[in-house]
Curated annotation (Swiss-Prot):
One GO biological process term: intracellular protein transport
Keywords, alphabetical: Cytoplasm, Cytoplasmic vesicle, Endoplasmic reticulum, ER-Golgi transport, Golgi apparatus, Membrane, Metal-binding, Protein transport, Transport, Zinc
Location relative to the cell: Cytoplasm; Cytoplasmic vesicle, COPII-coated vesicle membrane; Endoplasmic reticulum membrane; Golgi apparatus membrane
Protein name: Protein transport protein sec23
Protein's job: Component of the coat protein complex II (COPII) which promotes the formation of transport vesicles from the endoplasmic reticulum (ER). The coat has two main functions, the physical deformation of the endoplasmic reticulum membrane into vesicles and the selection of cargo molecules.
CDD domains given in the database record: Sec23-like, Sec23_C
Membrane topology: Peripheral membrane protein
Chain residues that bind Zn(2+): 63, 67, 86, 89
Principal location class: cytoplasm
Domain of life: Eukaryota
UniProt source species: Aspergillus oryzae (strain ATCC 42149 / RIB 40)
GO cellular component: COPII vesicle coat; endoplasmic reticulum exit site; endoplasmic reticulum membrane; Golgi membrane
Subunit structure: The COPII coat is composed of at least 5 proteins: the sec23/24 complex, the sec13/31 complex, and the protein sar1.
């Protein structure tokens, strides 16, 4: 099968199962696997939209303990004997009584050959409706606070009618608003400079007095019993009160001198929010949504002092270990993140500030709990408002697309073992026969807790080939390795759902089987390797990570390219490997591994988004797309991400996922400034100027977070966003000045892709890594 047909096949599998594998044939021995260089891995999107598949309204049929695999199309079913054989542990299981009518021709949906992904609505209802706690920073300008209040009031109409809502505001003090008290505005105040233990928070809020009575049945529309009901009210009952409280919010009254930052106790507000939820709502779906407009400057978790002359930490400070508050703040927020994750609660952080707010220190609050991280200049910006609204997107039945309190378990057949996961989750420390000996990412477990999950949440799951002792019993036909992904989550309709994806791939033949190389998916592999590189970058030095990326690339090319030893001119890669070196070239230069021009908060944000998206979107972040528009061609033409693509009479549209940029070449910019497009007879120029805007609108329409939109001209200051992403094939060191070169000269010492490839070929053919 040729490469294009294979790509279509992998794309169909991704649409059906939400999964892309780095290798679509598994090596049959551990020795063979070690020579692959790129690990066997899957980028899995559990809640990928599947409009055509039915929701099964019954419990899944599972294998006996300890296996617990779910019945799937790969199971052998004996309809006469009413038994099925589990493909994971080969145990025989009786079919339940309600399967008595099945025959070879009438089978239940989960056994249909195309039902490799299926979703069940479980009988177990969620213990409470979804909970939303807004944690609002009041140390901000009037216009910004007003815009934020308007957005929050509007968001109440997007929540499910039975959702519980709470409000905490903070500045110099943290205040928990008692929404259930209607006589007047009433709140509990916590001092911003003091650290409160979980028990203290619960005592001060009176949460320990009655407690939720165990084993009490819950009605879905009623708030749970217990003292927390004073602070968390159902939207449908209390929309008026909540709106009133939000509209009456004032700026923090504490005076701020000109040479000082406002006193902001983000850490105290967060610990109060986590304490409020963990007392009464353990293992219930809830979101703590933090809106901050500046760094924490007092109390636990503060990231900078109140003096303005003391700057926020930079990457340079972190490298030199010149960080006064960093380690203590990280320790505080990480402990908070673990508490929230253990209880199934999500933490989102929305920053509306030109300066850093301490996302670097707080990142694990979001990363451990599957929350959203959003970095904007102000809460007045459309980027914040539109991104925030997208979080509350709904399905055809008017249910929120977000899932709560989610967990993922991976089962494998004896040939495979799971080595870890890289994504927004924490380990559930579950051991099984599927757990491998080595560790990649969050390892030593076969189950993870994600808390928050949405249709684009994607996870990198890594595998190894098990040690097979002695010759395996030869089975007729090709042997298969299998994996099953079980995703449990609380649906916003009030029920628990289970989504099951079962994947089977052939094992390779004897050593040197060509099907192994042909099964390499370079796009999925690049994304899986990028996740490992970013995971390493969190703990290792930057140069060490770059060396690791280079070493792995050289080893892969040495293993799979065709060449004569020590002859770089003979170097050839098969079609399904040719793009991989260029993905690695752009990954090395990307904002995920290079800190130049990025603050630590921005780096934390970019890495967070990379670890959330699927293969297609992640590739756009690693290697942005570039389209060219000109009067000679109709519509857009994809062009190389190269400085040679900049032409005076062309318009370029760059999509980096985080930015969408329209760049007018020199001549086009002059024509536009002269107003030719408004004159009669120049309709084609007007259409040319409009076309990239239309395409940009389409790109923005379904993206989260909303990208920053930039329109610039050749020579303008904003053009730097484009120039920094291009391969510098035309620099001040190539080509003579005054020559007839029409492309842009880039002043940089970075090597070009051509130089990078020359070095790669030289090293690969010499057999040194």
């Amino acid at each position: 099968m040729d490469y294009e047909a294979l790509k279509d096949q992998w794309s169909d599998v991704e649409d059906r199962d939400g999964i892309r594998l780095s290798w679509n044939t598994f090596p049959s021995s551990r020795m063979e696997a070690s020579r692959l260089v790129v690990p066997i891995g899957a980028v899995y999107t559990p809640l990928k939209d599947k409009p055509d598949s039915p929701l099964l309204q019954y419990e899944p049929v599972t294998c006996k303990a300890p296996c617990r695999a779910v019945l799937n199309p790969y199971a052998n079913v004996d309809v006469r004997a009413r038994i099925w054989i589990c493909p994971f542990c080969l145990m025989r299981n009786p079919l339940p009584p309600h399967y008595k009518d099945i025959t070879e021709s009438t089978i239940p949906p989960e056994l249909h050959p195309l039902s490799t992904t299926i979703e069940y609505q479980l009988a177990r209802p969620a213990p409470t409706p979804p909970i939303f706690v807004y944690v609002v920073d009041t140390c901000q300008e009037e216009d910004s606070l007003k815009a934020l209040k308007d957005t929050l009031v509007m968001s109440l109409s997007l929540l499910p009618a039975n959702a519980l809502v709470g409000l905490i505001t903070y500045g110099t003090m943290a205040q928990v608003h008692e929404l259930g008290y209607t006589e007047c505005a009433k709140s509990y105040v916590f001092r911003g400079s003091k650290e409160y233990a979980a028990k203290q928070v619960q005592e001060m809020l009176g949460l320990l007095s009655a407690g939720v009575r165990p084993n009490m049945p819950q009605q879905p529309a009623r708030p749970p019993l217990g003292p927390a009901a004073r602070f968390l009210l159902p939207v449908q009952q209390a929309e008026f009160q909540i709106t009133n409280v939000l509209e009456q919010l004032q700026r923090d009254p504490w005076p701020v001198a000109n040479d000082k930052r406002p006193l902001r106790c983000t850490g105290v507000a967060l610990s109060v929010a986590v304490g409020l939820l963990e007392t009464s709502f353990q293992n219930a779906g809830g979101r703590i949504m933090v809106f901050t407009s500046g760094p924490a400057t007092e109390g636990p978790g503060h990231v900078v002092g109140p003096e303005l002359k003391e700057p926020m930490r930079s990457h340079h400070d972190i490298d030199r270990d010149n960080i006064k508050y960093y380690k203590k703040a990280v320790k505080f927020y990480d402990a908070m993140a673990k508490r929230a994750a253990n209880n199934g609660h999500i933490v989102d952080v929305f920053a509306g500030c030109l300066d850093q707010v301490g996302l670097l220190e707080m990142k694990n609050l979001v990363n451990y709990t599957g929350g959203h991280m959003l970095l904007t200049d102000s809460f007045t910006s459309s980027q914040f408002k539109q991104s925030f609204v997208r979080i509350f997107d709904k399905d055809a039945n008017d249910n929120l697309l977000m899932g709560f309190n989610a967990s993922l378990e991976v089962l494998t057949t004896k040939e495979l073992k799971v080595t870890g996961l890289i994504g927004h989750a924490v380990s559930l420390n579950k051991k099984s026969s599927s757990v491998g000996e080595t560790e990649c990412g969050i390892g030593n477990t076969c189950a993870w807790k994600m808390c928050g999950i949405d249709p684009s949440s994607s996870y990198g799951v890594y595998f190894e080939i098990a040690n097979q002792g002695g010759p395996a019993a030869v089975q007729p036909g090709p042997q298969r390795g299998m994996m099953q992904f079980l995703t449990y989550y609380q649906h916003s309709s009030g029920h628990y759902h289970l989504r099951v994806t079962t994947v089977a791939r052939n094992l390779s033949g004897p050593a040197g089987d060509p099907t192994l190389a042909q099964s390499f998916d370079q796009e999925a592999a690049a994304v899986l390797m990028a996740r490992i590189a970013v995971f390493k970058a969190e703990v290792d030095d930057g140069p060490d990570v770059l060396r690791w990326v280079d070493r792995m690339l050289i080893r892969l090319c040495s293993r799979f390219a065709d060449y004569r030893k020590d002859d770089p001119t003979s170097f050839r890669l098969e079609k399904n490997f040719t793009l991989y070196p260029q993905f690695m070239f752009h990954l090395r230069r990307s904002q995920f591994l290079q800190f130049f021009n990025n603050s630590p908060d921005e780096t934390a944000f970019y890495r967070h988004v990379l670890n959330h998206e699927d293969v297609g979107d992640s590739l756009v972040m690693i290697q942005p797309t570039l389209d060219s528009y000109s009067l000679e061609h109709e519509g857009s033409q994809p062009v190389l991400l190269d400085s040679a693509s900049i032409q005076p009479s062309h318009i370029l549209l760059l999509d980096t996922f985080f930015h969408i940029l329209i760049f007018h070449g020199e001549t086009i910019a002059e024509w536009r400034k002269a107003g030719y497009q408004d004159q009669e007879g120049y309709e084609n120029l007007k259409a040319l100027l409009e076309q990239p805007k239309e395409d940009a609108r389409e790109l923005i329409s379904d993206r989260f977070p909303l990208p920053r939109f930039i329109v610039c001209d050749a020579g303008g200051s904003q053009a730097r966003f484009l120039l920094s992403k291009l391969n510098p094939s035309t620099t001040h060191t190539t080509g003579g000045y005054g020559g007839g070169v029409t492309s842009q000269t880039i002043f940089t010492d970075d090597v070009s892709l051509q130089t990078f490839m020359d070095h790669l070929m030289k090293l690969a053919v010499s057999g040194t890594s």
